[in-house]
Amino acid sequence: METLKNKFREKATALNAEIKDMLAKHGNLKLGEYTIEQIYSGMKGVIGLITETSKLDPIEGIRFRGFSIPELREKLPKAKGSNEPLPEGLFYLLLIGEIPTDEDVKNITIDWQRRSNVPKHVFDVIDELPLNAHPMTQFVTGIMAMQTESEFAKAYSRGISKKEYWEYVYEDTMNLIARVPRVAAYVYRRKYKNNQHIEPNYNLDWAANFAHMLGYSDPNFQNLMRLYLTIHADHEGGNVSAHTTHLVGSALSDPYLSLASGLNGLAGPLHGLANQEVIKWIFQLKENLGGGLPTKEQIAEYIKKTLAEGKVVPGYGHAVLRKTDPRFTAQQEFYRNYIKHDDICEIVQMIYEVAPPILEATGKIKNPWPNVDAHSGALLVHYGMFEYEYYTVLFGVSRALGVLASLVWDRALGMPIERPSSVTTEWIKNYIAKQITEKAK
């Protein structure tokens, strides 16, 4: 699809010139200071990356190219008869920085359909894994097996100029995004549906076709996938999956290797695995409180009991956010618009009403509000997806949109290999002693 590629070329050329001028005039300007505590606490708040696609505000939440989630739900093109945005439109926005037209989105859908064939050896490699392998293990294995198809790796081996890197990364990105739903659906049907696979339906958009290949025909589940794959796509550049994809890509590893690395980070319990932990915790809560619909008072006591046992309330808190995650709110609205009543979703709502003041009262939690994971599992369960381990694969399909759009920008802007400095605790101690001595003089 040369129109999109040419439009990106124009945007990248203009931004490169702007950055070159900015560095010449203001390259020595300091952005701020950081503390020893920040180094020991995951570099939280330390500005160290450039990510063009999105920015996370502690109060407002994520903004994709300046647009909030409510704005995107209103402005992005939608499938006929749907009120939810098409992920193809979000990808266009992340890559180009503009709201696409219906025609722009239709062209991306057609292009991804054209690119979506997955080589047989990819499925053969997945089939060599034991059925009890975690879905993320199978998913990432499939992506690694597809690396044989990397246009960037082939071009780099032939010898290309640095200015050409982004063009081949773009091709890999478009191919990868087209194919990851097929690999993800294959893993789901292999592990949970007795290897009864479903061929793609090219009359459907990217998200609806993914729902179809998973085996879900309910139009509202298709709508859920459109929303889910849109709101999970990007969360600025410092989270583990985005940063890892960027970091590995900075070594000029191709997009297949880079995405697989990022998804391995997403599989961690502190990142993308959290959504399955939330729904498991809610079912434990429900069972311990008698199996029916509990009261707010019962939920409050269960939360206090959870905290007293030294455990966390999954789905609450965020490294950056200090208010309710707008992605949580978007899923709340989906529930009200499409479902009306569901016991698990009602429990999610009651937890939302009682948990924040309890968490805040502990004095240990900076953000007592729900994040995106607090609601997503409940919606999936409503439509019959009880396979909690698989939820992170859905997250991974979505996150590919954001991290790969960023990877194209990384190569277009000529970003160098990432190589920060590191020090030892002994070095820190000596630095502190030196500062104390200097102040005493």
Feature roles, as predicted:
Residues 1-441:
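Hydrophobic alpha-helical bundle cores within soluble ligand-binding/oligomerization subdomains
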